[in-house]
């Protein structure tokens, strides 16, 4: 036995020799006071205090009270305008990534262009649709192109602009982020300066899609870029510098071509944000599927000015 340690004593077992089903225990003082208070309450009254919410009349004993309906939320109507939508997820067990540039018209109609990857297939197609107001600051959206119809719901900010949306068709798990898009024309000069990004994508290898992730730091000037990418492919980490070019149309649709220091070539379709806050791109190489928002430093400075 170690010096200074107390002698171990087994726990004392309570004496149950005289215990019967009729044995009575004294009620705690708090319970006695509660019962006394309830005895003098008028019918239908609720006891105020830290015991919780009032149980509605007719509630079954032992069940949790039913919450009262919340006060109706005052919401702005869905706001017409031009938007860019970046979506990523799975549809019918295939990875899906897309960028939409669309206009919400005042009559509730939608017109736009869809850049989309579905597995190893890329397509670019115009579409039309409708949007409508839903309760609790939401919008219902339906879009149709030459091959399919999709539906989704978006949550709206205080000004009625969609911020995030979710696909609502069966076997579709796709979430999207929205960006306001000015109606002004775009040019490559909007990207001049520093652009940072982080992305998660997928690579086709050995007959299956495997996850990857990358962070990037780019410097743009007059449509040309120099950058560094740090990538994770699971078993390995890769660092490479790269260079490339972007060709931008007045409609803000763009094409990006890049080559890195390891010899790999990358191809993207993109949408430049007309306010100069960056660009979104979608990879078109069949064995690599990445969609991402590449944020210009000026967007960060607008959100949180440097000291």
Predicted regions and their residues:
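Bacterial N-terminal signal peptides
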Residues: 30-42
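Sec/Tat signal peptide C-region and signal peptidase I cleavage site
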Residues: 44-47
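N-terminal secretory signal peptides that target proteins for export/translocation
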Residues: 1-26
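General helical structural elements
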Residues: 20-28, 67, 302-304
């Amino acid at each position: 036995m170690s010096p200074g340690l107390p002698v171990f004593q087994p726990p004392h077992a309570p004496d149950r020799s005289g215990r019967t089903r009729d044995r009575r225990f004294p009620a705690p003082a708090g319970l006695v006071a509660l019962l006394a208070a309830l005895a003098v309450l008028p019918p239908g009254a609720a006891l105020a205090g830290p015991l919780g919410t009032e149980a509605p009349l007719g509630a079954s004993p032992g069940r949790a009270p039913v919450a009262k309906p919340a006060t109706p939320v005052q919401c702005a109507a869905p706001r017409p305008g031009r938007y860019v939508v970046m979506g990523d997820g799975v549809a019918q067990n295939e990875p899906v990534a897309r960028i939409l540039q669309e206009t919400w018209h005042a009559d509730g109609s939608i017109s736009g262009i869809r850049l989309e990857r579905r597995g190893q297939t890329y397509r670019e197609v115009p579409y039309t649709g409708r949007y409508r107001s839903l309760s609790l600051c939401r919008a219902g959206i339906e879009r149709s192109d030459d091959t399919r119809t999709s539906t989704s719901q978006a949550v709206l900010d205080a000004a009625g602009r969609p911020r995030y949306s979710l696909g609502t068709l069966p076997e579709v798990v796709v979430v999207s982020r929205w960006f306001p898009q000015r109606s002004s024309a775009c040019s490559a000069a909007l990207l001049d300066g520093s652009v940072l990004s982080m992305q998660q994508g997928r690579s086709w290898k050995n007959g299956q899609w495997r996850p990857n992730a990358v962070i990037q730091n780019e410097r743009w000037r007059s449509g040309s870029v120099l950058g560094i990418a740090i990538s994770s492919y699971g078993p390995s980490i890769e660092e490479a510098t790269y260079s490339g070019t972007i060709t931008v149309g007045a409609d803000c649709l763009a094409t990006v071509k890049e080559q890195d220091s390891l010899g790999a070539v990358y191809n993207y379709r993109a949408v430049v944000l007309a306010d100069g806050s960056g660009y979104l791109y979608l990879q078109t190489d069949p064995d690599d599927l990445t969609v991402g928002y590449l944020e210009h430093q000026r967007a960060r400075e607008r959100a949180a000015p440097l000291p």
